[in-house]
Regions:
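The substrate-binding groove and active-site-proximal loops of carbohydrate-active enzymes
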Residues: 14-24, 49-64, 111-130, 155-159, ...
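Conserved, mostly hydrophobic/aromatic
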Residues: 16, 36, 44, 73, ...
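Polysaccharide-binding and catalytic clefts of secreted carbohydrate-active enzymes
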Residues: 106-268, 282-283
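Carbohydrate-binding surfaces of carbohydrate-active enzymes
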Residues: 200-203, 274-651
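Aromatic-lined substrate-binding rim segments of carbohydrate-active enzymes
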Residues: 30-38, 45-108, 234-242
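N-terminal carbohydrate-binding accessory modules
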Residues: 1-43, 56, 71-72, 79, ...
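Short, acidic/polar
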Residues: 23-38, 131-135, 251-262, 319-327
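Short, well-ordered coil/turn segments that N-cap beta-strands
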Residues: 10-14, 40-42, 74-80, 142-147, ...
Length: 651
């Protein structure tokens, strides 16, 4: 068919991952497209594992099948996100270039047969990935069904390669960072166990059966994340030689792979998530992190329709409207695309019993109608959802460096950085718009920045920017366990903190990194303050006390302090406190008063209310509001049914 380029348009799209190359049957494809239209599916992503379909033999490329499918999709008014197939090189490539397979820490090469088991440092692998990416972009870039590209799939440094390319790359990475080996030895304190290195080639990648130096483990993780990001950027560069459509790479909810670094050259942040049936606050946490990375809306490129399962169905039965609310939550929080994995269950191979929109025999899953329900809602709210953004003047730091550091050193037993931020602090702000940001994020948009467990403040120029932020009128709520480590997971030697004592007007007299119920505290007004897990007690050297310890060795010492600096103020927290107490320190009013199972999102003068725990919730309305979805008006104390949504505008 004759085709012409179609420009990408900003609008809410619901879609599915599609693998037509598995069956290669026109009758099945036609039935698929008919059912997609029935549900309101407007976009598919495909091609990510199809290398052997596109290049059966080296240098012999054939995209005719995918052009044929894309022609059908275009006729059905369904858009395409086409993916590079780099996660699954074919057998001929492995046979000829065996060095493309990653090496396990025991020295064995991985075996052909899975995905993402390939070395991102391998010159042959990078060359072949670049070649097929070029070919795909050159041949498909002008197809009218195409709206965007995805490169690779769920890249992660968790499965590390120990080949000679990666070892040399690691040595070069360390040399670039530290300059000379003496500086590395000094920074890591290698005299500790006679670990002194003579040159960078001496620095051996850490194996899991060794009690490794924390700085070594952290930098090895950092190297693989950087190497992966460079690999992704090469794919993006290949695509952009032939196309100006948006390019992204789909990532998982892990901080091992640095999101900001990986998305430096992408046009859109892409995100895959699968969670327990009752755990919708967890993706909400990640949406608040994804949204500030770029100025453009993020895309959910994979999420479950019903059950998950790499090996068997799991993650819990999806009760009525779970799929509906999961879809709505992403869009309410700022997603522009929500794609289910996947359209049709596989009839063979890995992930055989992972849920999908259709069964392998082509029948709708039991909750497929919820997709259409969400699509119909989005149509009613299309102007609101396409023309407004989620904006916040409150930010909370969620740091890749802190995540990595607390994985290799533990200031107190059982410190789970992600769990503490998610469960302890972020959850308390479910009735506020809040951004989660890494340390390189600009602070201009915010009035208040919260930095719990921000182990390293002295990176990406953050220390200097936080000082200016406060002086210019911002409120910085920092701690506990913040500014306690350098970026290589080593301590400061002149004070417990890097610069916080001097800046915040405090002196740390006592530190107890051990949980106990003996230590108590209270606010200055006498109300009890819950403290736990670790305890820093402060003497005031310019700050004022907001809360003090009332027992044990810490009695009379401050646990929360405040100091005015310029037009703003810095508040330091010396123990793990409840999220509600952090909200008290912020001092802002919520969007509305609502029960804890209700998530609220404000977008200009609209409020989206979502019940996310599958039980009845409630909201207190000040005035009369109209629900855009039902066209009904409400006021006062109202009920929100389980897994339901209201889009409210004040009358």
């Amino acid at each position: 068919m004759e085709v012409s380029n179609k420009r990408f348009k900003r609008e809410i799209k619901v879609g599915a991952a599609y693998y037509p190359e598995i069956l290669r049957n026109d009758a099945v494809i036609d039935d698929d497209l008919s059912k997609m239209k029935e549900l309101g599916i407007k976009v598919v992503r495909m091609g990510e594992f199809a290398w052997s379909t596109i290049e059966k033999r080296e240098g012999e490329y054939d995209l005719s099948f995918f052009r044929h499918v894309m022609d059908k999709l275009y006729e059905a008014e369904i858009d395409v996100i086409f993916c590079t197939p780099s996660p699954t090189p074919p057998k001929w490539l492995i046979d000829k270039y065996s060095e493309t397979l990653a090496v396990k820490e025991n020295g064995e090469r991985k075996q052909f047969g899975a995905r993402n088991d390939y070395c991102k440092s391998s010159p042959a692998y990078r060359e072949k990935v670049g070649m097929i990416s070029h070919k795909i972009a050159r041949e498909l870039s002008n197809h009218p069904a195409l709206i965007a590209w995805q490169v690779n799939n769920e890249i992660s440094p968790r499965e590390k390669c120990f080949c000679s390319y990666c070892k040399k790359g690691f040595s070069n990475f360390l040399k670039e960072k530290y300059g000379d080996i003496g500086a590395l030895n000094a920074a890591w304190g290698t005299n500790r166990w006679s670990l002194n290195y003579r040159d960078f080639d001496d620095v051996i990648p850490p194996k899991s059966d060794v009690w490794n130096h924390p700085s070594l483990s952290l930098e090895w993780e950092r190297f693989h994340s950087k190497n992966n990001a460079e690999f992704i950027n090469e794919e993006i560069k290949a695509i952009k030689e032939y196309s100006n459509l948006p390019v992204g790479t789909d990532m998982m909810p892990i901080l091992d792979q640095n999101y900001y670094q990986t998305n430096e050259h992408t046009d859109v942040v892409m995100f895959n998530h699968y969670e327990q049936n009752s755990f919708l606050m967890y993706p909400s946490f990640w949406y608040d992190y994804l949204r500030p990375i770029k100025d453009t809306p993020f895309w959910v490129t994979e999420t479950q329709v019903n059950w998950n399962g790499a090996h068997y169905p799991e993650f819990g039965y999806r009760t009525e409207n779970n799929c509906y609310i999961n879809t709505w939550l992403a869009v309410a929080k700022g997603a522009e695309v929500n794609i289910y994995w996947h359209w049709r269950e596989h009839f063979a191979g890995q992930e055989l019993y992972h849920g999908a929109v259709l069964s392998s025999s082509g029948r709708f899953c039991y909750n497929a109608y919820e997709i259409k329900k969400a699509v119909d809602d989005f149509h009613k709210c299309r102007k609101l959802l396409s023309n407004t953004r989620v904006k916040s003047d409150i930010a909370m730091h969620f740091s890749t460096t802190a995540y990595r550091s607390f994985n290799v050193v533990q200031p107190f037993k059982g410190l789970n950085y992600l769990e503490l931020l998610y469960d302890r602090y972020h959850k308390a702000f479910r009735h506020y718009n809040i951004d989660l940001i890494d340390t390189q994020r600009d602070l201009t948009d915010y009035k208040t920045v919260i930095s719990p467990f921000l182990s390293c403040v002295d990176e990406n120029g953050l220390k200097e920017r936080m000082i200016e932020f406060v002086k210019n009128g911002g409120t910085w709520i920092v701690g506990p366990m913040s500014d306690i480590l350098k970026d290589n997971a080593t301590k400061y030697t002149n004070a417990p903190y890097g610069f916080l004592e001097e800046f915040a007007g405090i002196y740390t007299k006592i530190q107890i990194p051990m949980d106990t119920d003996i230590i108590k505290a209270e606010w200055k007004d006498g109300i009890e303050l819950s403290v736990e897990k670790s305890f820093d007690g402060y003497v005031l050297t310019g700050a004022e006390s907001l809360a003090e310890y009332t027992s044990s060795y810490l009695k009379g010492l401050a646990v929360i302090t405040q100091k005015k600096v310029g037009k703003g103020k810095v508040i330091v927290i010396g123990s793990v406190i409840n999220g509600e107490d952090v909200v008290r320190l912020v001092g802002e009013k919520p969007i509305l008063k609502a029960s804890e199972n209700v998530e609220l999102v404000q977008r200009e003068d609209y409020i989206i209310a979502l019940e996310i725990e599958n039980k009845q919730g409630n909201i207190d309305l000040q005035g009369t509001y109209r629900d855009i979805l039902t066209e009904r008006s409400y006021s006062g104390h109202i009920t929100l049914e389980a897994f339901s949504v209201m889009v409210l505008k004040k009358e």
